[in-house]
Amino acid sequence: MHLSEITHPKQLHNLSIHQLEEIARQIREKHLETVATSGGHLGPGLGVVELTLGLYQTLNLDRDKVIWDVGHQAYPHKIITGRYHNFHTLRQKDGIAGYLKRCESKFDHFGAGHASTSISAGLGMALARDMKGDNFKVVSIIGDGALTGGMALEAINHAGHLPKTNILVVLNDNEMSISPNVGAISRYLNKMRLSPPIQFLQDNLEEQFKQIPFVGETFTPEMEGLKGGMKRLAVSKVGAVIEELGFTYMGPVDGHNLEELITTFNQAHQIPGPVLVHVATTKGKGYPVAEEDKVSYHAQNPFNLATGKALPASKPKPPKYSKVFAHTLVKLAENNPKIIGITAAMATGTGLDKLHGKLPKQYIDVGIAEQHAVTLAAGLASEGMRPVVCIYSTFLQRAYDQIIHDVCIQKLPVFFCLDRAGIVGADGPTHQGMYDIAYLRCIPNMVVMAPKDEGELQRMVLTGIKHTDGAIAMRYPRGNGYGVPLMEEGWEAITIGKGEILRNGDDVLILGYGSMVYSAMQTAEILSEHGVAATVVNARFVKPLDTELILPLAQRIGQVVTMEEGCLMGGFGSAVTEALMDNNVLVPVLRLGVPDKLVDHAKPDESKADLGLTPSQMAERILQSFKPRLSTINV
C-alpha cells in the first residue's frame, strides 16, 4: 500500500510492521518535501511518525479521541487522516493549517496551537464521556516541551485524583521544546529515558520467577507481594513521581520501534484509570541535518532539501525586528548588569539567544511557563533589577492575571517586549498578535508603545529600560524592518506619551500606530493624487495617548482616521475615539484595523488585503467615508 492510498486511519489496522515502516518512510518523505517547499515546522513531526502510526493502529478514530498538544507535532496525523493530496497547500492561504483545527477535519478532535493544553482537554472529554455513559478511548499526546507548562501539571494533578476515569497520556519526550528543555522536570525526564521500561519489568517478573529451579515451580499468588514490591522498587527509581500522582506509568518506550509501540499502547488501553506512556523520540528523525541541529530545524522557511540550507533571497533584506531588538538589548545590558532578559522557551525566536551567548548571567529561560515568567520578573523588579520579558504577543495572553496582580497593582517596573505583534501570517489564528493593544491599555500603571520602524525600536528599547514608574510594553511585528539606518549606541530615549508629525495637510488627519505608520504615509501619498492633503502622525504611544498633539489637530482638521495592526475593539482607534469624546472634540472618526473576526493563515500581505489594510484600499475607504465632506475631490 502506498501512503497516497490512505484516506482513513483505519486502513492502518491490517498492515504488517514491515508495511507500517514503509508508510513511515513515505510520511517523512512527504513531510520533508512539503516543508522544504512551503516552510513550516519540521523537527517535531519527523519525530512522531512511528508514534502516530503505532497509536493509530490501536484506535478507532471514528469513535476514539486523540488530542495533540501544541499542534505542530501533528503533520503525520494530518497526512494519514485524508489530507495527503492537499498537504502541499500547508500554511498557504485557503490551504491546510499548520496547527489543528476542528473545522478542518473530523479527526482534529481539539484545536491546538499553544502548548500544554492537551491533558486538560482530554480529561474534559473523558469526564463528559463518563457522564453520558459513552464508551470511547481518550488519548492526549503531549511533548515538545509542553510538560514544562503549569497547565499540564495542573491537569495531571486533577486526573490523578480520578482513578476511575480512563485517560491515556502519551509523553513524546524528545528532550526539546523549540530550544533544549530547561528545568527540574526536564532533568527528571532525562533520567527516566536512561532507565529500563517499568512495564517490561512488571510483565516479565512472573515468567522470570518460574524459570528459577524449585522456587519457580511453587510460584503462588502469595508471591504477588514480592512481585509488587519489585515493581515499586523499579518505579521508585524511574516513574515514582508519575505513579505517586495517581497514574500508571509505562516506559520509556523506543519511539521509533513500531512493534514495541503497538504492544505498549495495546497494554495501556487495558489498564483502568489514568495511564502515562513515556515515549522517547528523536526530534528531526530521518533527516540528518535536523537531528544534528534540532533548534534551527524546529521550523524552517523554504530550504534546499539536499543541503538543508535556506533558499537564497532574491535580494538582500533589512534585518528582522527581533534581531535589531536583541542587538540593542545586548548593547544596553553590557553596561547595565541589572538588565535581565527573560524568555519562556523562545530564546531563538525572540533573539534572546544572543543575550545568552554574550551575557549568560543576565539571561533566564523559564520553559513554557509564561505565568511564572511574568511573576518572576515582578520579583526581580521588586529587588531593583530591570527585568525584560521577551515574549510573543499571543503568548503573553496566558499571563494576563500576573500582569495585573503581580506587576501593575504593585507598580513594578517590568519591561514587556512583545514580538510577533499584529498579523503573523502562516501560523494562523492561534498565533496572531491582534489583542495586546486592547488587553494592555486598560490596565493602570501600564505604558504601551510601538515603533514605526527598526530605528525607532532601538530608541524604545532604551525608553523601556529607563522607565521605572510602573510597567511598560513595546509591541513590534514579525519580519524584516524597512532598512532605516541603525545606531550601534548613543540612542535617545523617547519622552513617554509623545508622538510626532510626519506629514502636514489640512483635509484629513491620519493617526498611524506602530507597524501601520509607513502604510499611513503611503496612503497619504495616494490621497494626494486625488487632491486630498493629509496630516500623518506617528502616535508611538496608545497609552498614554499624546492628546496634546492629537486633540488640536483633530479639532482643526475635522476628520480623523486611525490605522492599527490589531483588533479594532478596544484598540488604538478606540483609544483615540475615547479621547476625542472625553474632550468634546466631536469629529468623524474612521477606524482601520482588524474587525471582530479571526484571521486565518496566509501570507501577511494576503491577510492585509483580505482585511482592507493595504494603502490603496485604505485610501479608497477614506475617500468614500468622507466623500460628503470632500465633495470637491475627484473620487
Curated annotation (Swiss-Prot):
Catalytic activity: D-glyceraldehyde 3-phosphate + pyruvate + H(+) = 1-deoxy-D-xylulose 5-phosphate + CO2
EC number of this enzyme: 2.2.1.7
Gene3D superfamilies according to UniProt: 3.40.50.920, 3.40.50.970
Cofactor(s) this protein requires: Mg(2+); thiamine diphosphate
Keyword terms, alphabetized: Isoprene biosynthesis, Magnesium, Metal-binding, Thiamine biosynthesis, Thiamine pyrophosphate, Transferase
Pathway(s) of this molecule: Metabolic intermediate biosynthesis; 1-deoxy-D-xylulose 5-phosphate biosynthesis; 1-deoxy-D-xylulose 5-phosphate from D-glyceraldehyde 3-phosphate and pyruvate: step 1/1
Binding site for Mg(2+): D144, N174
Annotated GO biological process: 1-deoxy-D-xylulose 5-phosphate biosynthetic process; isopentenyl diphosphate biosynthetic process, methylerythritol 4-phosphate pathway; terpenoid biosynthetic process; thiamine biosynthetic process
Stored SMART domains: Transket_pyr
Bound cofactor: record note: Binds 1 Mg(2+) ion per subunit. Binds 1 thiamine pyrophosphate per subunit.
Family: Belongs to the transketolase family. DXPS subfamily.
Name by which UniProt lists this protein: 1-deoxy-D-xylulose-5-phosphate synthase
Gene this protein is translated from: dxs
